[in-house]
């Protein structure tokens, strides 16, 4: 088992990473919440089918009363209606301020459950139990919670750190191939923004990674978590350095919104977003052609990314509604070299439209 501490101004907690760690979930939770009695496990139907038994046994062994609450999975369920539905179900089941929430699922479940925990009775503890690669290396860590609006992604939310994160790579045995590969892009992002060695490893050992080599996957998760923990620890509320974690996300979120969250998996949209801002960086001569080619090639190598058929101008307009837009100026994270990025405010609307047009072409010709 690997332990990565996350130290923020509001809370310090551990991310525990290891195969079979869910079987000891109750013991680990009991260490940080010795008096808790009732655990509301928010999950989706497919995840509950595979992992409810193990989680129930682990929690009841430590004296927890376990209550499962199901929500739909996918970005379309990431809305205020889901929040109200879960909160009302918790009230009906007798939840109080001594209750805890366990978020058992992917990024959407974690974001929604975390948001519910942050606002239910003005805040109750939340334990993150991520079941996708993407959630284990990114969304379960750092305290970002929230839901989408029709106008854009994650526009209503809170910063609310979990009490503990339990990342069990063993759950990937039931994870569909497309979802697994989609999640790998968050690790690739970590390599570009901070860790050249991680990027190099993903280039060198791509075949072993896509074949889910257990030791390599655990290493990849652990090192990606270290990047996230370091950045979040330095900037909990995204006022400065934490913005680098949005590499690829600004245009990626616009692609998701333009397709009504029905077409791309999150990691796939981020991959296209990373390619787009890399093209922009090369056009602005912020990075050299060799670096740009390495990033673009690795993004294309890890998965067959969905074709892009959106209207470039409409998608570019959605970028302006991104939460990273301040006083009408959108902040883009551009790569300079592998392991180093910059926050740019001089990217024109025309450059964004052109990048999306280039993505469309690239998505069809490969």
UniProtKB/Swiss-Prot annotation:
In this chain, Zn(2+) is annotated as bound at 186, 249, 266
An example of a GO molecular function for this protein is: 3-dehydroquinate synthase activity
What remark does the entry make about the cofactor?
Binds 1 divalent metal cation per subunit. Can use either Co(2+) or Zn(2+).
Disulfide connectivity?
A: none
Q: Where does NAD(+) bind?
A: 73-78, 107-111, 131-132, 144, 153
Which Pfam families does the UniProt entry name for this protein?
DHQ_synthase (PF01761), DHQS_C (PF24621)
Answer yes or no on keyword Transferase.
no
Listed A to Z, the keywords are: Amino-acid biosynthesis, Aromatic amino acid biosynthesis, Cobalt, Cytoplasm, Lyase, Metal-binding, NAD, Nucleotide-binding, Zinc
Give the matching CDD domains: DHQS (cd08195)
Gene Ontology BP, a term: chorismate biosynthetic process
Subcellular localization is given as: Cytoplasm
Looking up PANTHER family in the UniProt record yields:
3-DEHYDROQUINATE SYNTHASE, 3-DEHYDROQUINATE SYNTHASE, CHLOROPLASTIC
- Record-stated family: Belongs to the sugar phosphate cyclases superfamily. Dehydroquinate synthase family.
Q: What does this protein do?
A: Catalyzes the conversion of 3-deoxy-D-arabino-heptulosonate 7-phosphate (DAHP) to dehydroquinate (DHQ).
Protein name in UniProt? 3-dehydroquinate synthase
Q: Which organism is it from?
A: Koribacter versatilis (strain Ellin345)
The root-end lineage is:
Bacteria, Pseudomonadati, Acidobacteriota, Terriglobia, Terriglobales
Q: What gene name is given for the protein in this entry?
A: aroB
């Amino acid at each position: 088992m690997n332990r990565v501490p996350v130290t923020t101004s509001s809370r310090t907690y551990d991310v525990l990473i290891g195969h079979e760690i869910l079987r000891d979930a109750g013991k680990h939770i009991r260490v940080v919440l010795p008096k808790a009695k009732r655990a509301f496990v928010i999950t989706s139907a497919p995840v509950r089918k595979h992992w409810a038994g193990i989680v129930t046994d682990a929690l009841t062994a430590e004296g927890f009363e376990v209550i499962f609450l199901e929500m739909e999975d996918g970005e379309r369920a990431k809305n205020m209606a889901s929040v109200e539905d879960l909160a009302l179900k918790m009230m009906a089941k007798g939840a109080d301020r001594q209750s805890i929430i366990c978020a058992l699922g992917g990024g959407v479940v974690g974001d929604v459950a975390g948001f519910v925990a942050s606002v239910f009775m003005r805040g109750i503890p939340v334990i993150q139990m991520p079941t996708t690669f993407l959630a284990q290396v990114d969304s379960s860590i750092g305290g970002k919670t929230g839901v989408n609006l029709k106008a854009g992604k994650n526009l209503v939310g809170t910063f609310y750190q979990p009490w503990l994160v339990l990342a069990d790579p063993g759950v990937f045995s039931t994870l569909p191939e497309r979802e697994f590969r989609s999640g790998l892009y968050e690790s690739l992002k970590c390599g570009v923004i901070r860790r050249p060695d991680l990027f190099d490893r993903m280039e060198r050992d791509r075949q072993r990674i896509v074949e889910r080599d257990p030791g390599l996957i655990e290493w990849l998760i652990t090192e990606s978590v270290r990047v996230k923990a370091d950045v979040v620890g330095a900037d909990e509320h995204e006022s400065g350095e934490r913005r680098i974690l949005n590499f690829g996300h600004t245009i990626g979120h616009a692609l998701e919104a333009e397709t009504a969250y029905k077409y791309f998996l999150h990691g796939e949209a981020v991959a296209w977003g990373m390619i787009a801002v890399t093209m922009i960086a090369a056009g602005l001569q912020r990075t050299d052609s060799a670096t740009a080619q390495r990033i673009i090639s690795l993004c294309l190598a890890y998965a067959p990314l969905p074709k892009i058929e959106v209207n470039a101008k409409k998608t570019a307009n959605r970028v302006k509604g991104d939460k990273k837009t301040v006083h009408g100026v959108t902040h883009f994270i551009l790569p300079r070299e592998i392991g180093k990025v910059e926050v740019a405010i001089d990217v024109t609307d025309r450059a964004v439209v052109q990048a999306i047009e280039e993505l469309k072409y690239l998505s069809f010709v490969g």
